[in-house]
Amino acid sequence: MKLMIASDIHGSAYWCKKMLEAFEQNGAERLILLGDILYHGPRNDLPKEYAPKQVIAMLNPLKDKLLCVRGNCDTEVDQMVLDFPVMAEYAYICCDNLRIFATHGHKYNCTNLPPLSKGDILLHGHTHVPVIKDCGDYTLSLIHI
């Protein structure tokens, strides 16, 4: 199964559109969103084309293709307008003999690891800096759109 992974849209219609174009062009079957979907948070500047309602309108039709976890800027109010679950702190994904631990990164990350087994993959966003790192027994991937 082909997965696309993104994080930290922060309500940007511009980056959401770019992400969905890449999702379509690459023929991915599922889109994993690692949190911070609609709100930019009090410490961050407004992202390019900040338009949470447009992001909602773009993502809701894809609800059956999305797997999302909660970011530190996501709240219960966001869940009220999104047609797909966004409140889980993490998700285990088993795909093509891989076990993936997907989380936002504000709780579990490379300095505070979740329970991982040899060969597992840890996905998280939050840092806004993309990184893929082989850590011996597991692989660390920090994602940002």
Residue ranges and their predicted role:
Residues 2-95:
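Core catalytic region of metal-dependent phosphoesterases/phosphodiesterases
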Residues 82-117:
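Repeat-unit-sized solenoid/scaffold elements
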Residues 77-82, 112-117, 131-137:
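Short loop/helix-cap segments at secondary-structure boundaries that form the rim of catalytic
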Residues 64-67, 99-100, 120-121:
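Short active-site oxyanion
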Residues 8-9, 102-108, 120-130:
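Histidine-centered catalytic micro-motifs
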Residues 143-145:
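Conserved small/polar residues in nucleotide/adenosyl-binding loops
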